[in-house]
Swiss-Prot record:
One of its GO terms (cellular component) is cytosol. GO terms for biological process: arginyl-tRNA aminoacylation; glycyl-tRNA aminoacylation. GO terms for molecular function: arginine-tRNA ligase activity; ATP binding; glycine-tRNA ligase activity. SUPFAM superfamilies: HD-domain/PDEase-like (SSF109604). This is Glycine--tRNA ligase beta subunit. It catalyses: tRNA(Gly) + glycine + ATP = glycyl-tRNA(Gly) + AMP + diphosphate.
């Protein structure tokens, strides 16, 4: 059997939402620190359950390790003469270091080359190395929050109850986190009583499985939950739509997952589906089952129990009772809330403070109405529907249902609006006003929805910047302004809203009373929003300089930024020489224009054209302008760049054969006007001169 090392840290219940990250961090630190000690092995494997994290190192080299100190000697130039013989300086250094000529090594750097020697400074046994390695790894585990216990200063995510360190059969004796290491395993908290003796490190997962009723392998446990829960759903002609975060959390809550099927009364299916799902998933950590026919929720759900028992019905009934009680509450709130119309809750918004300095939610509603009225011109949404959506947008925040289930704000408003027979698009807008909630969340689906979402987000951003224009979000972001700004930019860019960003922010500022230094606030907001554009595309590994080259010519109107970035990226990856030609040509045009500070008219006088090169140039220029008057898609921009690439040949011929700085001022100005027009044609896509094609996308 090959050499195996194991370290297990047994704790009290670890936080389920961070269990996987803690275990993976432990494994990562073991790998990183093993490099420091030149430890050779085949692979590592990590384990995690609610009450333990462990790392196993497989096929480990157990030989003692020599640690070397590298000493730098004289430079190569001073170490050897022209014949390659050691100089007196070199001989003195060799004598000092007590080494022979064959023992020297060489160090080559950008600053020069030197002779060096490596000498053994320390020899450590594998046991010593593993003790130090684990100490450093534990010290550097990434843990969200630490806690102390007992009367010592030791800190960990949760109190530590036992530590195992085994190299094959041998216990690595050490004090770890205040406890002496041993070979005693703890099995399942409820299904086993006695400690389990671990004779060999390699037996760890198998012994826990067979004797301890614990599936230590996190991924194996997760796979079992997925597989058996799906089988349970199929038994009632249903399917699961398991959210990744929920599956990870459930996996981190159980050591021995047992799948059970539970039900609730069909009458509760009349409640909003999102409320049912929220209660089942968030409140009870169970899995809702959906119909295979229409995707709606069924009156069955999956319970993932942490115990295998002879009386599973007791567990099922316990979960059903809890679910039933919460559904009854939701049913009561729904009936009570819908006794009056959603719009009738609007006056109550004056009792809810939006922000101490920014007024109430009723004040916010009035500002959103003013802003959405203006925004609707650019989103082509029905202005009356937009105003109605704004009036209703925050009304559900004062209902009983939202008070009980605050995570469902907007969703509840949508159902109440539909109950009041409001138009469907308006109801959907109430739900979607908070989208996108995270970087990859869906955008609002209709014009009213993204008009309302934009107005709501801009109002919040402007308000918070107005009370703190030096808002520091470098580390902490208590109001989630980064997420808010990302949502604003995604809506404008992805929905291709032809709106002036400066005007939008100015309109928002004017809806607030008594705002000072609005110019400073506006400047700060613009910079903040533009930084989010970089963030959006940087995450998808787009070239930073490409984004910058486009934004320089789109400081106010953000239309077509997305297809431009994707088009230039496509040409960059597939036709780099074409992009390089566009960059060189535009730089040449720009450099000439920089030499002339006069105000040159953009009007080209055709009568002043003298040479065939400038005539050909202006003819082709007019053709391209007409062809690409409204280039909106990625494909059109790619086509335009390929056309401009051919056009570059005429530009270079113009430069080579036509005197720009003509002695006759009218001719010179006319030729400069041609160059200005060419530059503006390039600017239709990007300021190519700012693109760094050496950066890897």
């Amino acid at each position: 059997m090959k050499n195996t090392f194991l370290i297990e840290i047994e704790t009290e219940e670890l936080p389920p939402k961070s269990l996987k990250a803690i275990a993976q961090s432990f494994n990562k630190q073991i790998i990183e620190k093993s490099k420091t000690y030149y430890l050779k092995y085949k692979q590592t494997k990590w384990f995690a359950t609610p009450r333990r994290i462990a790392v196993m190192i497989l096929d480990i080299n157990t030989s003692d390790t020599n640690f070397y100190l590298q000493t730098k000697g004289p430079s190569i130039k001073n170490a050897f003469d022209k014949l390659g013989n050691p100089t007196s300086i070199m001989k003195f250094w060799m004598q000092k270091m007590n080494i022979k000529i064959h023992e020297i090594t060489y160090l080559n750097t950008n600053k020069g080359s030197w002779v060096t020697c490596s000498k053994i400074t320390n020899k450590k046994s594998i046991q010593e190395i593993l003790i130090e390695l684990c100490r450093l790894a534990i010290k550097n585990i990434s843990i969200p929050t630490f806690m102390k216990w007992s009367n010592n200063d030791i800190q960990f995510s949760r109190p530590v109850r036992n530590v195992i360190m085994l190299l094959n059969h041998e216990i690595i004796r050490n004090n770890v986190l205040g406890l002496e290491t041993n070979r005693l395993l703890s099995g399942h908290k409820f299904m086993t009583n006695n400690k389990i003796i671990l004779n060999h490190a390699y037996q760890y997962p198998e012994l826990l499985l067979n004797s301890g009723k614990v599936i230590a392998d996190y991924d194996a446990r997760k796979h079992k939950i997925q597989k058996h829960a799906s089988i349970a759903a199929q038994s009632v002609n249903g399917i699961l739509k398991i959210k990744t975060t929920l599956l990870e959390e459930i996996t981190a809550l159980v050591e021995w997952p047992t799948i059970l099927l539970a039900t609730f009364k069909k009458r509760f299916l009349n409640l909003p589906q999102e409320i049912l799902v929220h209660i089942i998933e968030k409140k009870q950590r169970c899995l809702p089952i959906y119909s295979t026919n229409n995707g709606t929720i069924l009156n069955s759900f999956v319970v993932v129990s942490n115990i295998e028992t002879s009386y599973p019905n007791n567990i099922v009934r316990g979960n059903e009772r809890v679910i039933h009680a919460q559904f009854v509450d939701a049913e009561f709130f729904f009936k009570k809330d819908t006794k009056k119309k959603l719009i009738d809750y609007k006056p109550l918004l004056k009792k809810i403070i939006f922000h101490d300095t920014l007024g109430t939610l009723l004040d916010k509603t009035h500002r959103i109405k003013k802003l959405i009225t203006w925004i609707s011109k650019f989103t082509h949404a029905n202005v009356n529907d937009c105003i109605r959506a704004a009036d209703l947008s925050k009304c559900d925040l004062v209902t009983n249902m939202t008070f009980e289930f605050p995570e469902c704000q907007g969703i509840i408003g949508m159902y109440y609006a539909l109950h009041d027979l409001e138009p469907k698009n308006i109801a959907i807008a109430i739900k979607e006003q908070y989208q996108p909630k995270f970087s990859k969340d869906n955008l609002p689906s209709n014009t009213i929805s993204y008009s309302l979402a934009l107005a709501d987000k801009i109002d919040t951003l402007t308000g918070l910047f107005s009370i703190n224009k030096n808002y520091n979000i470098s580390e902490k972001d208590p109001f989630s302004l980064r997420r808010l700004a990302t949502g604003i930019m995604r809506i404008i860019i992805k929905k291709n809203i032809h709106i002036n960003l400066y005007d939008l922010l100015e309109k928002s500022l004017k809806t607030y009373k008594k705002i000072n230094n609005s110019d400073i606030i506006l400047k700060k907001e613009i910079q903040f929003l533009f930084n989010r554009i970089y963030s959006i595309y940087d995450k998808n590994k787009y070239n930073h300089s490409i984004i910058k080259s486009i934004l320089e010519n789109n400081t106010k109107i953000l239309t077509n930024i997305d297809p431009k970035i994707k088009a230039i990226t496509y040409v960059f990856k597939n036709h780099p020489k074409i992009l390089q030609n566009l960059i060189i040509t535009q730089k040449r045009v720009s450099n000439i224009l920089k030499q002339f500070k006069e105000n040159i008219s953009f009007n080209i006088n055709m009568k002043t054209l003298e040479q065939i090169e400038e005539i050909k140039l202006i003819e082709q220029l007019n053709i391209i302008e007409k062809k690409y008057k409204h280039p909106f898609s990625k494909e059109t921009y790619i086509s335009m760049m390929l056309t401009l690439n051919s056009f570059c040949q005429l530009i270079h011929e113009f430069f080579n054969k036509v005197m720009i700085n003509h002695k006759i001022v009218s001719i010179k100005n006319n030729r400069l006007a041609i160059l200005f027009k060419i530059q503006n044609l390039f600017f239709t896509i990007s300021n190519f001169s700012n693109i760094n094609i050496n950066i890897t996308i």
